[in-house]
């Protein structure tokens, strides 16, 4: 008595065979064979919504919509190689019920990483399902170092951060800033806040005193939906 059985649900199912044995044309008493068929995880490939660098993605497969996810299913995975992404690591541990890691994009362009995941049913027989993939795009988050400049009164300073030398500057980066603070207070005019994204940081500044004065801008770099840590530009106005 042999056959290949498929359980299309996420719980244990039974199949009952009623068997009549025969020998030399003589039928014996029937008997039954009851087969318990444990479910095997079946999970479709996942394309995760893009995330910003330094944030986590989380995938917790659920039963339904073509997926078969038995109660207690756990996951192990390998990862594709991408030298521009840190924070991704393979996992062969048992008992992991979600796939989640915090990923960092060290470049200035979107990067992709692929997780190849093996699901195993936990509460229903430890049946190993076919692998599925999770594809995650990690968008870069701007990172700009603090800078200083010196100008003459009545002229403009301009700062246009570039990628490299510790900076991460995606091509779509724009900048906003709060009202700059001058030292001594009120010594410099021309500085104002920028509430909509600008491609450069530039303003014409006037030193109203007879002494050297400084003004500090606190700037937030933004690329798409990803905002970087604010940085400062300190301008000395002679």
Identify the residue ranges that each predicted region occupies:
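Extracellular low-complexity Ser/Thr/Asn/Gly-rich intrinsically disordered segments
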Residues: 1-238
């Amino acid at each position: 008595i042999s056959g290949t059985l498929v359980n299309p649900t996420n719980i244990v199912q039974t199949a009952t065979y009623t068997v009549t044995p025969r020998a030399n044309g003589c039928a014996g008493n029937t008997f039954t064979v009851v087969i318990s068929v444990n479910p095997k995880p079946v999970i479709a490939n996942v394309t995760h919504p893009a995330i910003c660098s330094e944030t986590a993605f989380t995938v917790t497969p659920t039963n339904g919509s073509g997926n078969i996810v038995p109660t207690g299913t756990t996951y192990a995975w390998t990862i594709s190689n991408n030298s521009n992404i840190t924070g991704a690591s393979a996992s062969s541990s048992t008992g992991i019920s979600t796939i989640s890691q915090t990923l960092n994009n060290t470049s200035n362009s979107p990067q992709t990483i692929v997780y190849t995941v093996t699901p195993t049913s936990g509460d229903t027989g430890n049946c190993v399902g076919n692998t599925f993939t999770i594809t995650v795009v990690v968008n870069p988050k701007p990172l700009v170092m603090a800078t200083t400049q010196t100008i003459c009164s009545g002229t403009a300073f301009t700062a246009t951060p570039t990628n490299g030398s510790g900076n991460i500057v995606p091509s779509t980066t724009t900048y906003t800033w709060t009202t700059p603070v001058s030292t001594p207070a009120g010594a410099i005019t021309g500085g104002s806040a920028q509430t909509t994204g600008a491609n450069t940081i530039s303003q014409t500044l006037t030193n109203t005193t007879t002494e050297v004065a400084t003004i500090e801008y606190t700037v937030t770099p933004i690329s798409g939906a990803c905002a970087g840590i604010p940085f400062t530009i300190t301008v000395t106005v002679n």
